[in-house]
Amino acid sequence: PKVIRIGYQKFNTLNILKGTGNLEKALAPLGIKVEWHEFLGGGQLAEALAAGAIDFGHAADGIGVFQQASGKGLVYLAAESPYPGGVGFLVPKDSPYQSVRDLKGKRVATGRGYNTQYTLIRALEAAGLQYEDVEPVYIVTASDTVAAFQAGSVAAVGLWDPFLAGAQVATNSRVLFDGKGLTANRTYHFAKPEYARANQDVLKVVFAELQKTNGWSQ
């Protein structure tokens, strides 16, 4: 049987769809099996997609921008609703920093190619600064990011929901800035162009099931 290899991250619509088993049922009449591959972040997922290790996946809009800029040849198929407040940068509650300008020359935790990095670049540009004006500390997982924050080894950390909301509850922190006015922070679904062209019937079923799941999860 043919297989669709889907990359997903936790706490996302694809992850919920995986849990329901509905996609497997919907694709069975087409003789398609589903293989699920979990990734820690959208950056790694997009790299796997570009390398041909998976066929279909999702990531935040910032990651898609980086991938397109690098000429990796991914095609956007659909986008979920904007969620600019779902990505942001935290500082300690008693921190003297009041805006992104105050991070000049400071160590800031973000993921390489993540929506947090894209948001940081946009925030710095909006403040008349460049990415080179901060010292980025690249961290892969949300838990390591929170650990760096708690250790005080960075001035600010970039996180995305549900980790952003969770960290605000678990740590003595406040949001210095989020994606509002800087990035839509949509979740995009994309594939390799050749896969999308050859498998429109399969992708139609995938999106029908995603739409049902999205309606249910909201």
Give residue ranges: language-model regions.
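Short, glycine-/small- and polar/acidic-enriched structural segments
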Residues: 1-131, 136-140, 155-161, 176, ...
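Pocket-lining segment of extracytoplasmic ligand-binding domains
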Residues: 62, 136-137, 142-218
